[in-house]
UniProtKB/Swiss-Prot annotation:
It is found in: Cell inner membrane. Keywords: ATP synthesis, Cell inner membrane, Cell membrane, CF(1), Hydrogen ion transport, Ion transport, Membrane, Transport. Produces ATP from ADP in the presence of a proton gradient across the membrane. The gamma chain is believed to be important in regulating ATPase activity and the flow of protons through the CF(0) complex. SUPFAM superfamilies: ATP synthase (F1-ATPase), gamma subunit. InterPro entries: ATP_synth_F1_ATPase_gsu (IPR035968), ATP_synth_F1_gsu (IPR000131), ATP_synth_F1_gsu_CS (IPR023632). This is ATP synthase gamma chain. Its main location: membrane. The keyword Transport applies. One of its GO terms (cellular component) is plasma membrane. F-type ATPases have 2 components, CF(1) - the catalytic core - and CF(0) - the membrane proton channel. CF(1) has five subunits: alpha(3), beta(3), gamma(1), delta(1), epsilon(1). CF(0) has three main subunits: a, b and c. Belongs to the ATPase gamma chain family. The gene is atpG. It comes from Gloeobacter violaceus (strain ATCC 29082 / PCC 7421).
Amino acid sequence: MPNLRGIRDRIKSVKNTQKITKAMRLVAAARVRRAQEQVLAGRPFADRLVGLLFRLRSRLRFEDVQSPLMERRDVQKVLVLVIAGDRGLCGAYNSNIIRRTVQYLRELQQQGKQFALYLVGNKAISFFRRSNFPIAKTLTNVDPNTPLEGANQLITDDILAPFLSGEYDQVELVYTRFVSLISSRPTVQTLLPLDPDALGQEDETFKLITKGGGFEVLREKQQVRTEPEFAADTIFEQDPTQLLDALLPLYLTSEVLHALQESSASELAARMTAMSAASDNAKKLLSTLTIVYNKARQASITQEILEVVSGANA
């Protein structure tokens, strides 16, 4: 016969765990909304920056512009920037980004290229420190909600210096693209050299909305507004090439920030999903334990009645 006290203790433990998972789910949902607000708040600056760069490129299209950030070289060594999480309890988020990174590194090895890793997040650091892949730099406790003094500027500085010095010929970014609350996509993107033809492409923003008593993600395409080109007789106080060289690092910083925000939203959405599943499992387990407890209690009462009746008959 099951121990009634043991079952009661287990039911109490499951209820406490369920409270924790529900709270973590709500916290993750609130942080996804905050990440959404950060993306929308930074969008006007990014739009104007891209628009200005597009106009400068159009003005300089007939000139031989040699910006060091757009210089394409024979790729011999690649710096791979990997953005993962600092904590667990977020489903397969960290394992997916690590798996995609390892796959990409194997591809570089097959091509005979050298590489080094720039790891962001404790989970990626702990995994790759146990591997044989070379690590150039690590960064933890990243907060993408501080765009001016935050990690995006630090990361940009860390990848710009070795690229401009020729230590690395290319910088690749591996991050998690936020698709929906139940879906994310590990993505590989070239950060450096910058592609001038990609400046006018479409971008997307995400918005967390409530629907049917739950949460849903609405993604919206944002067409970059390309303002009218500079007039042919426009006089610049500085050389347009110098302006381009000054604005390109800002564009790179905004790209890094965007990747941090997408990765952060993906991690939080994965944590929401994981905690929601844990809460549902706890509910099912409570139902099962309650049935077991009631059956055990009923059997115990029946046994006591039988003992009383047997004693009376004796």
